[in-house]
């Protein structure tokens, strides 16, 4: 019985260490969306591998938020598959169809370090994917590539 009681803390320590190690490449960033009185939280999937999985975009209203409580009023969200590690989330002007787009970037796990990105626009009650690019060179102009993708999508209609 004594031996089992000693083994239990050791087993817990191993499980806790494994859970922490699986989350070393996690990503969480809050991005202000001031024109809509919103804030977006972009986060990679918990306990997923670094090289593949998903990320979430959660949008909260800040219209009536007290300081420090800007993620209390959930409005909408989106879940997107990813092939690589989420590296950044930021606002960008992508032209007339997406003047205040939320951009999420990823870097592939392969030797080329290729870059991909998705652009989202928000409304008072929705978040919508407007463009996606993949396989870009590591030093590519992501905003320009997304603008071009939006233009192609518009011309295809």
Could you say what each language-model-derived stretch is?
Residues 20-157:
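Exposed acidic/polar residues on beta-strands and adjacent loops within beta-sheet cores, strongest
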Residues 14-19:
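N-terminal signal peptide c-region/cleavage motif recognized by signal peptidases
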């Amino acid at each position: 019985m004594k031996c089992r009681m000693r083994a239990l803390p050791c087993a817990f320590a191993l499980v806790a260490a494994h859970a922490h190690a699986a989350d070393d490449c996690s990503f969480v960033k809050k991005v202000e969306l001031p024109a809509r009185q919103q804030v977006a939280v972009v986060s990679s999937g918990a306990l997923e591998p670094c090289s593949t999985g998903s990320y979430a975009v959660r949008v909260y209203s800040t219209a009536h938020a007290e300081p420090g409580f800007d993620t209390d009023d959930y409005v909408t969200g989106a879940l997107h598959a990813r092939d690589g590690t989420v590296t950044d989330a930021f606002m960008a002007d992508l032209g007339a169809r997406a003047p205040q787009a939320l951009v999420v970037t990823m870097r592939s796990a392969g030797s080329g370090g290729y870059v991909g990105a998705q652009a989202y626009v928000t409304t008072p009650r929705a978040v919508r994917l407007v463009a996606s690019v993949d396989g870009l060179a590591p030093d590519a102009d992501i905003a320009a590539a997304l603008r071009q993708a939006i233009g192609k999508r518009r011309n295809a209609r």
